[in-house]
Design a protein with these regions (language model features):
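Coupling/hinge elements of helicase-like and P-loop NTPase modules
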Residues: 78-82
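GIY-YIG nuclease catalytic motif and its immediate N-terminal context
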Residues: 1-40, 46-49, 55-56, 64-73, ...
Length: 106
């Protein structure tokens, strides 16, 4: 997973308690995860807590985040799992901010 940068937007993928995946964007990942796990997040995750972050990809702006979210949600479950395994940032090279991604995947 990439490191967060102040004021950046993040595409995130959660694995819910029932094993399903949920994808969203946020500009505050920690707060958004707490909201999901408190049962006050998206309607989809409310009955599927707890959720854990399985992938993130930081974007340069909200527009890039929304476009990436839309593209990721169109993938099949298997394609999503493969992308998570390989690193979802590889799906969106046009949006990667080189200041945030130095090529290391620590």
């Amino acid at each position: 997973m990439q490191e967060s940068s102040k004021n950046s937007w993040c595409l995130y993928v959660l694995r819910c308690a029932d094993g399903t995946l949920y994808t969203g964007i946020t500009n505050n990942l920690e707060r958004r995860l707490k909201t999901h796990n408190s049962g006050k997040g998206a309607k989809y995750t409310r009955s599927r807590v707890p959720c854990e972050i399985v992938a993130t990809c930081f974007m340069p702006n909200k527009s890039a985040g929304l476009k990436s979210e839309h593209r990721f949600k169109k993938l099949s479950r298997q394609q999503k799992l493969d992308a998570i395994q390989e690193g979802i940032e590889k799906l969106f090279p046009e949006y990667l901010n080189t200041d945030q991604n130095d090529g290391n995947s620590d």
